[in-house]
Amino acid sequence: MSTTQKDITIFESTSSTAPLILLNTVQNEGEQVYNSVVSMTDVDFSMAAIGNLAWNREMTPWPAPAVMRGGEDFAGKADGYLKELTGTILPDILAKISAKPEYMALAGYSLGGLFAVYALYRTDLFDRAVSASGSFWYPDFLDFVKEHRFCRKPARLYFSLGNKEAKTKNPVMKTVEERTRELYRWYQ
């Protein structure tokens, strides 16, 4: 399925109330993620993997300079992408699946994990969020979280972080573990 220049792959459950997970993908790894999760759980769910994203533009909440030498600046267009996601992409997905999801969750890795949490402050459509190695080092994100409220308190938040992320020499990115822990404490 292709909508608004995004590539969308739907993995549909046969259950009429299976939750729907929306996964923003870095490199169209949706099928790999879906198969991995299916192999680890008996929980029935549908998943829509969304690819062909302008990662540094659409996953970032506000403009910020690049953190890698020679890297692309962050454009801060998350609100625009969220409008596209909730106004066009999600309705198209819901029209294509037969289930009426029990709940919907937003998931992502890296900047996609940052976006998953940020989106909870901008829309009440999602009941849960998954942030795998979320880019919580992003400038001013902790301040944003502390100064704003969720549109709808999520039933669940899941954070994970690998062993290597905080060991980078990059002074901005190396704060990711400390900031992830701080967010965890804030949400308790």
For the regions a protein language model found, what residue spans apply to each?
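Serine-hydrolase catalytic machinery in alpha/beta-hydrolase-like enzymes
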Residues: 6, 14-96
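Conserved hydrolase catalytic core segment
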Residues: 118-128
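Gly/Ala-rich beta-loop-alpha elbow adjacent to hydrolase catalytic centers
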Residues: 107-112, 116
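The feature captures the conserved acid-bearing segment of alpha/beta-hydrolase catalytic domains
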Residues: 136-188
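Short beta-strand immediately N-terminal to the catalytic nucleophile in serine-hydrolase-like folds
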Residues: 103-108, 132
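Loop/turn elements at helix/coil->beta-strand transitions in domains of secreted/extracellular proteins
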Residues: 16-20, 43-46, 102, 125-127, ...
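A conserved amphipathic alpha-helix that caps or lines the catalytic cleft of carbohydrate-
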Residues: 37-38, 120, 184
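Alpha/beta-hydrolase
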Residues: 23-24, 132, 161
